[in-house]
Each structure stands twice: as C-alpha cells, then as structure tokens.
Amino acid sequence: MQKSVRYNEGHALYLAFLARKEGTKRGFLSKKAAEASRWHEKWFALYQNVLFYFEGEQSGRPAGMYLLEGCSCERTPAPPRTNAGPAGARDALDKQYYFTVLFGHEGQKPLELRCEEEQAGKEWMEAIHQASYADILIEREVLMQKYIHLVQIVETEKIAANQLRHQLEDQDTEIERLKSEIVALNKTKERMRPYHTHQEEEDPDIKKIKKVQSFMRGWLCRRKWKTIVQDYICSPHAESMRKRNQIVFTMVEAESEYVHQLYILVNGFLRPLRMAASSKKPPISHDDVSSIFLNSETIMFLHEIFHQGLKARLANWPTLVLADLFDILLPMLNIYQEFVRNHQYSLQVLANCKQNRDFDKLLKQYEGNPACEGRMLETFLTYPMFQIPRYIITLHELLAHTPHEHVERKSLEFAKSKLEELSRVMHDEVSDTENIRKNLAIERMIVEGCDILLDTSQTFIRQGSLIQVPSVERGKLSKVRLGSLSLKKEGERQCFLFTKHFLICTRSSGGKLHLLKTGGVLSLIQCTLIEEPDTSDDDTKGPGHMFGHLDFKIVVEPPDAAPFTVVLLAPSRQEKAAWMSDISQCVDNIRCNGLMTIVFEENSKVTVPHMIKSDARLHKDDTDICFSKTLNSCKVPQIRYASVERLLERLTDLRFLSIDFLNTFLHTYRIFTTAAVVLGKLSDIYKRPFTSIPVRSLELFFATSQNNREHLVDGKSPRLCRKFSSPPPLAVSRTSSPVRARKLSLTSSLNSRIGALDLTTSSSSSSPTTTVHSPAASPPPHTAVPESAPADRAGDSTDMSPCRSPSTTPRHLRYRQPGGQVADSTHCAVSPASAFAIATAAAGHGSPPGFNNERTCDKEFIIRRTATNRVLNVLRHWVSKHSQDFELNNELKMNVLNLLEEVLRDPDLLPQERKATANILRALSQDDQDDIHLKLEDIIQMTDCPKAECFETLSAMELAEQITLLDHIVFRSIPYEEFLGQGWMKLDKNERTPYIMKTSQHFNEMSNLVASQIMNYADISSRANAIEKWVAVADICRCLHNYNGVLEITSALNRSAIYRLKKTWTKVSKQTKALMDKLQKTVSSEGRFKNLRETLKNCNPPAVPYLGMYLTDLAFIEEGTPNFTEEGLVNFSKMRMISHIIREIRQFQQTAYRIDQQPKVIQYLLDKALVIDEDTLYELSLKIEPRLPA
C-alpha cells in the first residue's frame, strides 16, 4: 500500500493566514468539481506561488491549496450548454469568464475556474503567470549580469580618470618650465636693448608725436564715452529708470509720513486711552478701546519694518529691488482685513463714546496736541484705509516704468493683484463709513457740540451758505439791496441738512461753528417748508419780488414751544431749487414714515417694518445685487453692487425714495448707463406703471389682512375716508372716480386715536400757522374713543405737517397722534399716496351704507398717481441740480419736455401735479435770469482796452481780486461729468475733459506770469519788491479763500529760476519770508493736502480750492477698485464715494464771488505777451546770478 505524502500542516495553515491578509490576489471564483460537472463558488487567495481556497470569505481554515510552481494558465471557452433551464440563466452563464490552470506533468487534472467579469479573470490569470519562482530566479540572474557589467564600466572609467589626472599634472609641470624659460629669455632681451631704448627716448620729435597720439587717443575715447553716456541719458530706458527711481523716492517719503501718522494714532490716542481705561473712574472701557483701535498698534509695527526695509534699499541705490519687501507685506494683509472689517464698527463705538462728556472732554484734550495739527481721531483711524490704494497706484506707476523682462515684474504684478483684492473691500468700508466720519467732523467743528450728529443713523445730505432774513424786520427790508454787505455779514449762516435735522450755524473768525441759540437745530418732522412765502406781510409787493424769488420759509412747530418761522435766502435760483428739492425729499421721508406707520398699523395686520423685511429683494444678496450693512435714509440697506436694472428699479420703487441714493445716482449714472435709458425708465413708469413695477413690490404695496381681499376688489373701505379740499402737490389722493372731485377724509377709530388727519393747502394769502380742520364722520360705536381724553394728553392739539411734495405752492399737511408725540418713524419712506393707498386697501370689516357710492380704493388710480409723483419728483431733482445735462444734450431736453407735456395732457392730473409739472417745464425752458456766471472767453472779449496796466501801477488788492474772479470763473465752468472716468489722464484728455485741461492751463499761465514779472527786473531791489508784492497778493487771495491763487503764486516763487536767486532773496524782508512759509504750509501737498482740507472745512463759500487735490482723490478711488465687478455689477459703493467728492466740488462751484470786473487788470493778467517760457526764464536767471565756480 502506497503511503500518503506528509507535509508541515501548521506552516501551511500559517501561509493560508498570510494569504487571507496579504495575498497578491483575493476574491470569489467558481471551481469545477472533479466527480461531477458542477461548479462550486469558493473564496481564493494567492500568496507567492501557492493558491489557497476557502469555503467562504470568513472561513479560518482553507479547504485546499494548489502549488503553482511550474504550472501555466490559459483561457478556455465556455462549455456547451443544454437547452434545459430558462433562457436568461443560459445567457448569464455564457457571459462568464473561464480559464484553466495546467500543471506540469501528465495525469494531473487541470484546475478549471470561472468568474463573473472578464476584467477580474484577466487579473487572476496575470497574477498566476507571475507566481512562478523559477521566473523570478531568471530575472534575478539577468539583473546580476547587468550589475556586473556596470561595475566593470565604472572600474574602467576610474582607471581612465587616473590616467587623465596624471597627464594634467605632467602638463602643469611642463607649463611651469616653459614659463620660467620665457622669463629668462625676456631678461636676456632686456639686457641686450638698453642702447636702442636710450636712443629713442632722446629723440624729441618721436616723443612729441607719441604725446600727440596719446592725447588724440584719450580725446577720442573720452568723446566716444561721452557720446555713449549722452545717448543713454537721452534714451527711453534711462528716462524710465529715472521716473522709476523718483517713484521709489516719493514712496519712501509717503511711507515715512504714514508711519508718523500711525505713531501719533498709537502714542497720542491708543496708549493714553488705555491708561485712562485703567483709572478709578474710567471714561471708556478697555473693550471700547480695543474695538476702536483694533490692530492699530500691530499695523504701526508692520509699517515700521516696511519703512526700514525701504530705507535699506535706498542705501543700495541705483539698484532698487522692492519685490521682496512687498513679499514680506503681503502675508500680513490679514491684519489689514481685520482692521477694515472693524472700521465701521470702530467709528460707531467712537460716536457712542463721545456721548460721554468726560470722554469727549478727554478726547478734545488729546486732539489739541500740536502733533495732531488739528486733526480728529476719526481722521487718523481712516489713514490706514487709504494706504493700500496708495500702494496700488505706486505699483501701477512702477510697472509702467519696469521692462517686461525685468526680474521684479512678476513679483510686482502679483503684489498688485493681491492689494487690489483688499482694496475693493477697503473702498466698500470707506464708502459705508463716509457718512459717520462726515457727521463726526461737523460735530467737532461746532463749539457747543451737537448730540444729534452722534446718531449714526443720521445721513448728511447738503451744506452751504444761506442768508437768514430776520422775520420781525421783513417789512423794513424792502429798501435793503439784495446781497448788501450789512445783510450778508449779519445774516450769513452756514446750514447743514441731514435726513432728520436741519442745522443753522454762524461761523466765527477762527472758522469754528456756533449753533443759533434759537432755531439752531430744526427737527424736520416739526417743519413745514414754504417755497414762496405769502405776501400778506407786505403792503406793496411780496418778498419774492423783494429778494428776487430767492427766499424760502421754514415754519417750525415744536410740541413744547410756540411756533416760529425761519426765512432763508439762497445765493441763486439754482441753489434755491437744489435746497428745496433736498429739504422736501427729507421731509417726505420722515413725514410719510410717521403717517404710514400710524395709518398702516391701525388698519392692517401687516406693519411697515414687516412690509420692508418681507421683501427679500430689499435686503438679501442675489446674483444681480449685493447689500452692505449700512442703512440709508429710508432704513433700507445700502446697495454695494447691483446691475443697472436693479438700480433703475430702486430709483422707481414707489414705496420709498432715499435722498442719498438719488443724489449718488444722478451724479454718477453716466458711468454705467445713459441719460436716455434713465429717462426711458421714468417714461415707462409713467406710461405703464403696472408692467414696470416688480410683481413682489406690487404685492407688498397692497399688503392687507388675509380676509380683506374682497374689499380690495370692490374698493370699499368702511373705516377710512380721506378728504381735502386741495390735495398737496404730488401727494396722491383718491376719489370715487377719476373725474369726480377728489375729496377724502380720515374718520372712525383712526380719527379717534390719532386725531383728525387733515390735508389742507394754505393759499398764498393764508397764515403759515393756520390749520383747517375738515369735519369728520362719527366713528363706529365699537371703535369710538371718548372725546374727554385724560388730562395728561395735553399734546393732542399740537398740529404737525406731514408729507410735502415737490411743488412751489406753500401748503401744510397736518396730523396728530396721542400724547402730542410727533410720528417719527425709522421705517422706509414712501410717498403720501402710498400711505393712503395701503391704509385704504387695508380697511377693516363692515362698510356703512354711506360709503358704498364713493369708491375710495381704486388700485389703478393710486398706482398711476404714485407713479406720476415719483416721475415728477426725480425730474425735479434732476433738472434743479443737474441743469448741465440738459444744456449740453438738446435731445435729452426735448424728450423731457415731451414727457412733461404728455403729463400735462393727462385728464386725471391733480391741480398740484399740474403746477409741479409746469414748474419743471419753466425751469427747463427759461434761462436763469439771476445767472451771473461768465465764461473766460466772454471776459476776454469784454477786456478790449486800448492799453493794459503794468505791474507797478496795480495794487495788490486789485490783482488778488481779479485773480480770484478769473480762477473761480474757470473753476466753476467745469461740468461734473468731466470728473468721471479719469479722463484727464487719458491720451485724448483734451477732447474728454476740455474744461479740466483749461483749468490746468490757466493755472500754469498765471504761475508763469508771476515768475516772468519778477524776472523782468534787472536790479536786485526791484526783484525783491516784486516778490514781496506777489506774496502780499497771495495773502489777500488767502483772505478771499482763493487757495488756488495762493498755490499759483507760491509755485511760481518756488521755481528753480527764482528760488536760486540767493542775492535777491536776501533783500526780501523776514516778515515776507515768514508769510510765504505760512502760505506754503497751508497749500502743501503733505498728508493728502491735510492743511488745505482743514482750511476749506473752516471757511464759508465762496472759495476756490485747488483742483488737483480732488483729482488726486478721484484717482485714488478709480485706481483702487473697478467700476464693475467680474459679474458685471455696478460698484455702487465706488459711485457713492465719487458722488461725495463731486458734491464737495459743486459746493464751491455754485457760490459766486461778488467782485466787480476791472477790464484793465484782467487784460494784464491774461496778456500772454508778458509770459516767458521756462527755458528762457532759467537762462535769464543764470545771466542775473551766474553759477558760482565749484
């Protein structure tokens, strides 16, 4: 009997365990049984050259194993199938993959396997093929042969290298030997030549010839080198490098100044306030200090390092490498990002802290430090916001003068891209906080302080000089000439308009403001604006004729004092129209908020704040709009980015109209759209109000209680009925039908709770404080309130004036609420028509029979009247504030006239709407009779004198006045659209911005004239006297607030042709030199013209600022962030910042000087024959005082 083969079972089981865990290939296969042609599914695991199979994947002991050494594996076709069984099963079996493992000797039955997928079968076959140990031995032998071959090659190379080394050493030895031989031969030759050399040196002719040759060679070399140097100096590359170096030098100076500003911020405010917060009675908490000065100290340390690096680079001049410095700065930008995000909150915390008197007193003490130079804390907090845009402009200029192959170019471009990303965020934050900083700056200028400006919800609208007419003496003023010095001096007021208040101040000689003791702060909710005061106080002719129709009246009715009247006089009709538009819009916003809140909440379950919040389009970001956290004057989030369609939609949203949005839109719409598109949108709103208004806005406009739908359909309101004999202009009223007399009155429970809501129009002959009460119907019994109210409601009889609309008709709209409290809501502003529409639409249940015949809720009529209101309101602002648009675009003017004429043909037009339309038509059609604006060309034609004056015969006062007159004429002739788009920096600047270029040309011509007149004198004393006279002219210009003229003269005196005349300057008196230093400090460009800005802030118009200061600001904004985002949205935050700058420029443009023209003086100032060009001036200067020898 043959014995069975023994094997080590324990080791086999261990190998099976390893195969389960680390096998080369594992998985389920079907194995064909030997005894029957049946297939059994087993779990196989291949480990090295042994194949194990298990009953299942979790089986611990193998069912069998196969030794694969010497075997082969090949694919076999599927075996033939019988027809038994379902067809689907046969198809499945045919699709399976079959292969067979064949063993080396005959008589051994092959192992037949199959799997479900062809890919798995191929992987198993490949793994079995590679499992042969014999194949691995063959591969190892091949590798060993290659290794031995490589070792032999290496040894051969080593031997060759040693041989080469020996050859080199031998050659070195040979070279040394040859050198020594050459030296010996040279010494031998030298000993053999002494006689011949002596002979040559002794020949004088040869010696002279050699000297001449040497001189000529040197001269030719020097000439050629000089030519090379001159060519390079004049080459574009050298010019580019000079400009690049100058940019770097300017950057170092600006960085030094910025570090100094941060040093003042940290050491003058942050650290002292930290110490104050640790005192026994701290005026401020440590948390507030941290909130105000977040990261300020870290930013200072960062820029100190950056500044030191810049100075170290200058030590290596002319090689200036800056890219690595920006590489150091870029990773620290997250510090700036935190500062930027905290900026708005920082100013809000500061405004709240200023309400603490102890803190405010301490802060004024810190701001009084001479190092602050009169600047406020919020100014220092804003400096870091402008630094990143400054870096971007510097990088733009550096890249413009950096060749494309320069080693720094890529690094500088990368730094610029990163800084631009942060700059966009910074511009948004600066735009959002502009209003807070403006309010705090005005509050700091007022000596007595003004707590209402510490309310961060106040939005600054407008400022300017107006003349206050004493109302008690109006009968005596008929003989006073308009613009007389006595009236202007005594009655001139600096007025500031905010969304909730109107401030009237006087300015002291030091530039500080003082609020009027009576009527200095007017709450707009208590004011009624009358554009054309009544004529009852004058027996002969009205004040409109007396003051040229430049006066308007504000009737103030405080709840705890007697009513009083403020009469103000505007410098021009255009200024009056602009003031009236802004004041009326602010009053509309506040009045309609209060009115709407009372009416709406009384008659509907939907409150006004809920109506705004429920419209997600007003506060939630979308693909075509993005909002900021700051609220506008209507308590709706300001727009940060938006498409043109969304901006036009906001302009025509009938629920509210924010005055700050409207002003920004009208200032900057040319950047992202055209006047024709804006007018087309207004025309669509008027002609098709329902199709032009978003559906969601219509739904919220008519938001009512859930069960009031049937009342909305039939237009009946049982609880409300409105009545006024003459509706307020543009304040839409409702009637029973469009052709009936429009009489509405508020009755019922609303009438009982808030008092009678009377909408009356005071005629031109009525008293401004007269109140006309319309009889109200008795309220229903279940809502009646007894007439005998509690005694503490003493204010129920106080009459307030609600919405007033843009019209020149004086009128009063009054309403009352319990306790005499004035309805001053913080909700969004809507027109009066909107308020009544919603109130009427949201009426309660049950209608008395008397109301069935009078239709008081016609939705279409309300929408039409409100749309007409909005169109006329926008057009009034547009025409009154931006008349240049229509003067320069006749097609736009004709289209507006056609639209207004179409409005006049509307049979349903209310009388006041008709009058407002006629006023706009009149403003468009007639020339402004009080327009005293002259153009420079007109003055040149008027100065046709036979002989011009000379410099000696003209006084300093005459020169200063006429220079001021010319500068202001040139300055105010610049249309505001030229400030958009940086046209003055483009190649076609003379075509795009002709007036800005003309202003620049006039500045240069006046400066050239000053320098030429000084250089015309041959003797030193005459030149010194001329310098002293021009300095006196500059000082008079300063007194006249002509800072452009000051800079014209000081820049002429600082020209190299005049500044180098040391002998002349020694003859100039010390007082004149000190005065000139004072003038130069005032108009210095240091710190973004900080001294000039502070001076302009403390002076009343008229004034002529330096235009370059504003152009620099606009360039900062334009370079720092694009007009459109990558998604194509308008950057409205940038538009807001541009609008603020244009508003400040136009403030100085619109107030004219009352200086008489002197043709002889003007002809002298404009005579170009007296001007000497720059090169001739310098040559003349060298003749007068030649250069001293070195």
Swiss-Prot record:
Domain Ras-GEF: residue ranges: 955-1187
GO CC terms of this entry: endoplasmic reticulum membrane; glutamatergic synapse; plasma membrane; postsynapse
Modified residues (Phosphoserine): 725-726, 736, 745, 749, 801, 805, 925
Record domain IQ: where: 205-234
Superkingdom, taxonomy of origin: Eukaryota
Ranges of biased composition (kind: Low complexity): 760-776
Gene3D superfamilies linked: Dbl homology (DH) domain (1.20.900.10), Pleckstrin-homology domain (PH domain)/Phosphotyrosine-binding domain (PTB) (2.30.29.30), Ras guanine-nucleotide exchange factors catalytic domain (1.10.840.10), Son of sevenless (SoS) protein Chain: S domain 1 (1.20.870.10)
Stretch list, region Regulates proteasomal degradation: 743-751
GO terms, molecular function: calmodulin binding; guanyl-nucleotide exchange factor activity
Matching CDD domains: PH_RasGRF1_2 (cd13261), RasGEF (cd00155), RhoGEF (cd00160)
UniProt region (Responsible of the affinity for farnesylated versus geranylgeranylated Ras), positions on chain: 1052-1081
Any Gene Ontology biological process: postsynaptic modulation of chemical synaptic transmission
Subcellular location: Cytoplasm; Cell membrane; Endoplasmic reticulum membrane
Region called Disordered, residue ranges: 713-744, 757-826
Occurrences of domain DH (ranges): 243-429
Coiled coil: 155-193
Sequence ranges of Polar residues compositional bias: 798-810
Task of the protein: Functions as a calcium-regulated nucleotide exchange factor activating both Ras and RAC1 through the exchange of bound GDP for GTP. Preferentially activates HRAS in vivo compared to RRAS based on their different types of prenylation. Functions in synaptic plasticity by contributing to the induction of long term potentiation.
Domain named N-terminal Ras-GEF: residues: 635-755
Organism: Rattus norvegicus
Keywords for this protein: Calcium, Calmodulin-binding, Cell membrane, Coiled coil, Cytoplasm, Endoplasmic reticulum, Guanine-nucleotide releasing factor, Membrane, Phosphoprotein, Repeat, Ubl conjugation
Domain PH: 22-133, 470-588
This protein's name: Ras-specific guanine nucleotide-releasing factor 2
Oligomeric form and interacting partners: Homooligomer and heterooligomer with RASGRF1. Interacts with Ras and RAC1. Interacts in a calcium-dependent manner with calmodulin. Interacts with CDK5R1 and probably EPB49. Interacts with the AMPA receptor through GRIA1. Interacts with microtubules.
Domain notes: The Ras-GEF domain and the N-terminal Ras-GEF domain form a Ras-binding site and mediate Ras activation.
Membrane topology designation: Peripheral membrane protein
